[in-house]
A protein has these predicted regions:
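N-terminal secretory signal peptides
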Residues: 18-63
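Bacterial N-terminal signal peptides that target proteins for export
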Residues: 1-7
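Functional cores of ribonucleases/endoribonucleases
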Residues: 44-111
Length: 111
C-alpha cells in the first residue's frame, strides 16, 4: 500500500512540475510584445490573419486543457519578412504566455 501511495505521489508531482512555467513581467517584454498585449486588451484589430487561431499545445509545455482553450497571436519582429518566432498565447482563463523561440519555451506574463 505504501508503495502505491508513493508511486502516485511521484506521478502527480512530476506532471505538476512539467507545467511550472517561468514568469516574466509585462513591462520587461520587448516593445512589440507590449504592443500585442495592448491589442489583446482592446480586442484588436490584429495585423496577421493567423492571429486568434487555436494553439494546440502539442509541445505540452503549457497546462493541458481541451482543444480550443489556447489562442495564439503574433508578436512583430523587426527586420523579419514573415511572422517570425515570437508569439503570445492566451488561455481562455485569462492567462498570457510569451515565446520568443517559436514554442520551444514559454514564460507566463505577469501584468
Amino acid at each position: 500500500m505504501r508503495f502505491a501511495a508513493c508511486f502516485f505521489a511521484l506521478c502527480f508531482a512530476g506532471s505538476a512540475a512539467a507545467w511550472q512555467v517561468p514568469e516574466v513581467e509585462a513591462a520587461t517584454l520587448p516593445q512589440e510584445a507590449r504592443e500585442t498585449l495592448a491589442l489583446l486588451r482592446s480586442g484588436g484589430p490584429f495585423p496577421y490573419h493567423q492571429d486568434g487561431t487555436v494553439f494546440g499545445n502539442r509541445e505540452a509545455l503549457l497546462p493541458r486543457r481541451e482543444r480550443g482553450y489556447y489562442r495564439e497571436y503574433t508578436v512583430r519582429t523587426p527586420g523579419v519578412r514573415d511572422r517570425g518566432a515570437r508569439r503570445i498565447v492566451v488561455g481562455r482563463g485569462g492567462e498570457y504566455y510569451y515565446t520568443d523561440d517559436h514554442y520551444r519555451t514559454f514564460r507566463r506574463i505577469r501584468q
